[in-house]
Amino acid sequence: GDCSCEGQICKCGYRVSPGKSGCACTCRNAK
């Protein structure tokens, strides 16, 4: 799923924790 990171959409983002809001962007091979 997509994740909002610093106002940008990170397709390969993921949630930090099931009970926490926010996300971590570790995008690899992003196009």
Swiss-Prot record:
Subcellular locations according to the entry: Secreted
Tissue expression pattern: Expressed by the venom duct.
Domain of life: Eukaryota
GO CC terms in record: extracellular region
Description of post-translational modifications: Contains 5 disulfide bonds.
Any one GO molecular-function label of the UniProt entry: toxin activity
First-listed, main subcellular location of the protein, grouped into a coarse class: secreted
Keywords: Disulfide bond, Secreted, Toxin
Domain comment (free text): The cysteine framework is VIII (C-C-C-C-C-C-C-C-C-C).
Protein family per UniProt: Belongs to the conotoxin S superfamily.
Protein name as it appears in the record: Conotoxin
